[in-house]
Regions:
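Beta-strand-rich interaction surfaces with strong enrichment in secreted/lumenal proteins
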Residues: 44-45, 98-104, 135, 177-180
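Extracellular beta-helix/beta-solenoid repeat scaffolds
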Residues: 169-208
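Core beta-strand segments of extracellular beta-sandwich domains
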Residues: 52-62
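C-terminal motif of bacterial Sec signal peptides marking the signal peptidase cleavage site
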Residues: 16-19
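Terminal connector regions
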Residues: 120-153
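Surface-exposed binding patches on compact interaction domains or structured appendages
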Residues: 21-42, 62-115, 120
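Low-complexity, Pro/Ser/Thr- and charge-rich linker/hinge segments at domain boundaries
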Residues: 26, 145-167, 171
């Protein structure tokens, strides 16, 4: 019986010690603020319905205590196509494009990854896409990181075979996938002001 009591007491002590350790790891500071490796994250220019390469930035806690955010969210949700991963958590529609209760230990950091999948803008010229990633603290204060990218509407040509005299004309860029092949006795004319961009592996091949 005595041994059983000692065992229970030891279990209680270990549980208490574990809880205290966790509290020490996340000793949340009510007034602490995070620091960022950028104040504006600029992504590449992207054609509509395609994705930019992923870029990232760091979030630092230079405080002597842990810092907790009530939420990290995209200000405009997914209206512009920005896709964000916060320390392994993807801000998708199932989460309302936000994550809650993000904590950064003292003198530690987390990494955030961002890309954008641009939709058609229905405009001739490149259009600026801009949103804010908002960090909200328990005291209601906020910090923002601005996200920027340019979206450019474009037509897509896939593995075009030119079998007769053909003219390509467009006021918006044309992205070529798979290449263009001009057969013998056929003429391909590219109208003045028309711009072609060839995707990786695509080329213009002229037979004969």
């Amino acid at each position: 019986m005595k041994i059983a009591r000692i065992y229970i007491f030891l279990c209680w002590v270990l549980t208490l010690f574990s809880a205290c350790t966790q509290d020490e790891l996340f000793n949340i500071s009510s007034g602490g603020r995070l620091s960022f490796s950028v104040d504006t994250l600029r992504l590449d220019t992207v054609f509509s319905n395609t994705s930019t390469p992923t870029k990232s930035f760091w979030v630092y806690n230079h405080n002597g205590k842990g810092v907790k955010c009530r939420s990290v969210r995209l200000e405009r949700g997914n209206q512009l196509g920005f896709q964000v991963n916060v320390d392994g958590v993807f801000l998708g529609s199932n989460l309302g494009y936000q994550t809650n209760e993000i904590a950064v230990r003292e003198q530690d950091s987390i990494r955030i990854y961002v890309k954008v999948l641009a939709t058609a803008t229905q405009e001739k010229d490149p259009q600026l896409l801009t949103d804010n990633l908002i960090f909200t603290y328990d005291d209601g204060k906020e910090q923002k990181i601005n996200l920027r990218a340019w979206a450019w509407d474009a037509h897509v040509l896939r593995s075009l075979q030119v079998k007769k005299d053909t003219t390509i004309s467009s006021q918006t860029p044309i992205v070529v996938y798979g290449g263009i092949t001009v057969n013998e006795n056929s003429v391909l004319t590219i109208a003045e002001g028309t711009t072609l961009y060839f995707h990786s592996g695509a080329a213009l091949n002229v037979k004969g």
